[in-house]
Amino acid sequence: MEKEYIHIILADDDEDDRMFFTDAFDELKINTKVQTFINGAELMNYLNEDTCILPNVLFLDLNMPKKNGIECLLEIKENERFKDIAI
């Protein structure tokens, strides 16, 4: 039986920030799955897929190309499907 994990998504266009973020969670003694996206458009495309596994926690960079964190946040808050995601 597979252990439950905390599904975490980070949307950030800075490669170093994504690396530091994932490394920090790797060092924790909790079972996590960290998924990263390089911009808000990529994140929203994923979240809007029918087969998407919704995260428990979502971290958004405010300044990203294509779609910034504020635009993503507004779009997420408008969708009832995403109401249980901690942002």
Residue ranges and their predicted role:
Residues D84-I87:
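A short, hydrophobic beta-strand element within the central beta-sheet of small alpha/beta folds
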Residues K3-Y5:
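Phosphate-coordination loops involved in phosphoryl transfer and adenosine-cofactor binding
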Residues D12, L60-D61:
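Active-site residues of response regulator receiver
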Residues H7-I9:
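Conserved beta-strand elements of the Class I
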Residues T22, T36-V57, L74:
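Acidic, metal-coordinating helix/loop segments flanking the phosphotransfer/catalytic sites
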